[in-house]
């Protein structure tokens, strides 16, 4: 492996051990199109109590928005949105004219219009979430002051859909994507 990770192959299976977190692409016979992505995240250190006020908790399982047409969760100020490991959310998250909102966890956003849509807001954070097959941008930001994106994973087979599009934003920090 290019990262120097030792591995063995037995009966069409690859075995390896990791001693630290990392993001890996496993490519068989140099096939970069049909690869396997492995995300070895650090253990979660912050799991909010689902009963705490200001917490929107998505437990393991499938979740759809209840809005019409059923494609968006609108988030209020001073909220922590937690996607637990095994949580699959089928919809985008909207923050408009809000502040102090965090999206954390190891869950997935699957097939949304966009993963995240932030406008006219302050102090927004994304950490650890994976977005799969959005129809458009993974993160769309407009006039956001204080946006932190860390350990975001995004995949899509659709055009213009796996990126971060920011317009008139300031104090933006993007790392480990």
Predicted regions and their residues:
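Extracellular/periplasmic carbohydrate-active domains that bind, remodel
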Residues: 1-177
């Amino acid at each position: 492996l290019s990262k120097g990770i030792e591995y063995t192959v037995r009966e069409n299976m690859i075995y390896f051990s990791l001693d630290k977190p990392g993001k890996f692409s496993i490519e068989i016979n140099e096939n970069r199109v049909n690869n396997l992505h492995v995300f070895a995240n650090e253990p979660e250190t912050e799991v909010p109590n689902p009963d705490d006020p200001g917490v929107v908790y998505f437990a393991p399982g499938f979740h759809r928005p209840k809005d019409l047409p059923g494609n968006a969760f609108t988030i209020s100020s001073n909220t922590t949105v937690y996607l637990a490991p095994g949580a699959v959310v089928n919809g985008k998250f909207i923050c408009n004219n809000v502040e102090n909102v965090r999206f954390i966890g190891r869950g997935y956003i699957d097939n949304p219009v966009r993963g995240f849509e932030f406008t006219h807001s302050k102090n927004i954070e994304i950490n650890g979430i994976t977005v799969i097959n959005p129809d458009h941008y993974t993160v769309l930001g407009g006039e956001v002051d204080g946006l932190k994106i860390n350990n975001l994973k995004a995949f899509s087979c659709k055009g213009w859909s796996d990126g971060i599009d920011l317009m008139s934003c300031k104090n933006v920090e993007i790392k480990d994507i």
